[in-house]
């Protein structure tokens, strides 16, 4: 019995995956090791095909007219593998451990003109295939295309009908797997009449060799045999240059701001001592700057429930991002494992929902919020609802085009169950703890009942200018690394420099905090006490710059095309920018709050 075309064993696999997501059992990043004896069968699974320049546009391998068993048996997949678009199925290839095969016939085929045209179109779009041997992905192109720009113009398309598998072993374990088409001529697909059948004979060979490498992670050539480009190792100099510029920027802002602030505190405290005989109101009338608004600076903002929800979800994603990077640094992710990061991200997201509930409810109660149930609902839906809407559009496009990236109904129900049984309850539990542990808001100054009138502000202190400056500077700190991240997620790179990623992430947060403090100081100096939302928007606008960069990357740095890839790219890029807005907006707000409390605590007042 099958479910949506996949075996029931896959549906039964959902229960252990759910248990896995609850933190029971081994994580998805644990690398399995299979031990073989000479002559033992080694199963080769066919997985997916798709355009080389559209990594997220993938289809089942057997959707092409290729050698296929009479009954297709699918491999049970983990949740992360399903989310990665994997659809592994058994193949006709017969491989035995340490037994070479010179040339063996896989199958004979008679292709119709429609099937030939399907293959021609796939080859013209640079379709690649992915097989999996002992959890090692091996990739190659479906065919060969040669086009001449000289006269006479030629356009030749050929299909690779022979594959040469090269496998390396150490002891009783497989270390490396690769496929090539060396010394093989492609079978021409040109010149076929519409009523003519094309006869093909698919063959393959297997070569085994022993290696001294004991672990797959030590195999520097990687799991793809150079099929995907590797250029990540060359960006050290750019990263170091970026770090130097960022440290100079942070140091400059910190030194200048501290000097100005120290002078302000000394002047204000001196003026306070000389006018100690008068009232505070009399003193305010003779002063200007950030001190004069001390009775309004802690006035609670409008839409406080939404503000607290932003802070809660932002804190959750800060914990989630830190957790993913730390797990990568500890070696829990392996390039050979399918969907490991996907599974870990879902697990961490579900578990960190308690953080969003706690932070949001705790601060909401501190600033006088009364509708804490509504606050919890808003917090739990602030990211999940935009994510669901984005995913619905993307998944519908994949489903309409028959892509393997479209999630089956069982997986959708599993993810919904995880959110309903783990994520949302943890948000509520965190909210209850946050509400009960909240103390009154600690404001160094009392707030008057009547709000002070805010004087007209110059154009360079407007929200738009603050968002431009506050968003561009943190973005410039990560722009170099952002290219490599995009090349990994939306291209064919493999990211392994997690140490650099950790430092860049720390630099991003540090720059965001420093810029937020500087912009908040300039805003308060203009007697504008509406800093609550401004601090979130100023540095949170980095997410907008990241989305604009994604548009630039799509247009100038990639060869992506087609509705499937385009919808997925812009949908999830917009969601990524939103996540960065939440994270950096949270860092910016709490940095500004800490700074404001510091300067007003150190200010002598009646």
Swiss-Prot record:
Cellular component GO terms held in the UniProt record: autophagosome membrane; cytoplasmic vesicle; lysosomal membrane
Acetylation found in the keyword field: no
Major localization class: membrane
Positions glycosylated per UniProt: 178, 401, 559
Keywords noted in UniProt: Autophagy, Cytoplasmic vesicle, Glycoprotein, Lysosome, Membrane, Signal, Transmembrane, Transmembrane helix
Transmembrane regions listed in the UniProt entry: 237-257, 310-330, 339-359, 373-393, 412-432, 469-489, 499-519, 535-555, 570-590
One of the GO biological process terms: autophagy
Region forming the signal peptide: 1-27
Subcellular compartments: Lysosome membrane; Cytoplasmic vesicle, Autophagosome membrane
Membrane topology of this protein: Multi-pass membrane protein
Entry annotated with the keyword Metal-binding: no
Pfam families, per database record: EMP70
Role according to the record: Plays an essential role in autophagy.
Similarity field: Belongs to the nonaspanin (TM9SF) (TC 9.A.2) family.
PANTHER family xrefs: TRANSMEMBRANE 9 SUPERFAMILY MEMBER 1 (PTHR10766:SF177), TRANSMEMBRANE 9 SUPERFAMILY PROTEIN (PTHR10766)
Name of the protein in its database record: Transmembrane 9 superfamily member 1
Species of origin: Mus musculus
């Amino acid at each position: 019995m099958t479910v949506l075309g996949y075996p029931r064993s896959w549906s039964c696999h959902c229960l252990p995956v759910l248990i896995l997501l609850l933190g029971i059992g081994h994580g998805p990043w644990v690398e399995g090791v299979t031990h073989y004896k000479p002559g033992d069968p080694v199963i080769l699974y066919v997985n997916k095909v798709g355009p080389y320049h559209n990594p997220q546009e993938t289809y089942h391998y057997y959707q092409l007219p290729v050698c296929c068993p009479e009954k297709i048996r699918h491999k049970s997949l983990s949740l992360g593998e399903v989310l990665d678009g994997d659809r592994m199925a058994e193949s006709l290839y017969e491989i035995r451990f340490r037994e070479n095969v010179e040339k063996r016939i896989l199958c004979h085929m008679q292709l119709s003109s429609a099937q030939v045209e399907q293959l021609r179109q796939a080859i013209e779009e640079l379709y690649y295939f992915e097989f999996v041997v002992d959890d090692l992905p091996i990739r190659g192109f479906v065919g060969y295309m040669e086009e001449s720009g000289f006269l006479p113009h030629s356009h030749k398309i050929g299909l690779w009908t022979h594959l040469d598998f090269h496998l390396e072993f150490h002891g009783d374990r497989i270390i490396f797997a690769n496929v090539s088409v060396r010394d093989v001529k492609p079978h021409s697909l040109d010149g076929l009449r519409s009523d003519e059948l094309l006869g093909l004979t698919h063959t393959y060979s297997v070569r085994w060799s022993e290696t001294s490498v004991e672990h797959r992670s030590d195999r520097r050539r990687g799991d793809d045999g150079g099929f995907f480009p590797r250029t990540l190792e060359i960006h050290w100099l750019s990263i170091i240059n970026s770090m130097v510029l960022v440290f100079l920027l942070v140091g400059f802002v910190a030194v200048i701001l501290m000097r100005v602030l120290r002078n302000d505190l000394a002047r204000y405290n001196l003026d306070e001592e000389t006018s100690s005989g008068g009232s505070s109101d009399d003193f305010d009338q003779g002063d200007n700057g950030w001190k004069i608004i001390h009775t309004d600076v802690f006035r609670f903002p409008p839409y406080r429930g939404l503000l607290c929800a932003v802070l809660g979800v932002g804190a959750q994603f800060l914990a989630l991002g830190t957790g993913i990077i730390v797990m990568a640094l500890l070696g829990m992710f392996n390039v050979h494992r399918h969907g490991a990061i996907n599974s870990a991200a879902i697990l961490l997201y579900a578990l960190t929902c308690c953080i969003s509930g706690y932070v949001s409810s705790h601060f909401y109660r501190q600033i006088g919020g009364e509708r804490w149930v509504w606050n919890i609902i808003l917090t739990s839906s602030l990211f999940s609802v935009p994510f669901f809407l984005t995913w619905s559009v993307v998944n519908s496009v994949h489903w309409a085009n028959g892509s393997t990236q479209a999630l089956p109904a069982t997986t959708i129900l599993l993810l919904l169950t995880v959110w309903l049984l783990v994520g949302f309850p943890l948000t509520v539990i965190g909210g209850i703890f946050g509400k009960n542990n909240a103390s009154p808001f600690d404001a160094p100054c009392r707030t008057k009942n009547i709000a002070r009138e805010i004087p007209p502000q110059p154009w360079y202190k407007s929200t738009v200018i603050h968002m431009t400056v506050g968003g561009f500077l943190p973005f410039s700190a990560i722009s170099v690394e952002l290219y490599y991240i995009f090349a990994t997620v939306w291209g064919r790179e493999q990211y392994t420099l997690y140490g650099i990623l950790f430092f860049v992430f720390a630099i991003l947060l540090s720059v965001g905090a420093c810029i937020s403090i500087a912009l908040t100081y300039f805003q308060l100096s203009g007697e504008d006490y509406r800093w609550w939302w401004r601090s979130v928007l100023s540095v949170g606008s980095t997410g907008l710059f990241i989305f604009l960069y994604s548009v630039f990357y799509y247009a100038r740095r990639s060869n992506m095309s087609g509705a499937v890839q385009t919808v997925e790219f812009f949908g999830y890029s917009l969601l990524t920018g939103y996540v960065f807005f939440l994270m950096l907006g949270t860092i910016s707000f709490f940095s500004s709050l800490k700074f404001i409390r510091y300067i007003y605590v150190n200010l002598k007042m009646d």
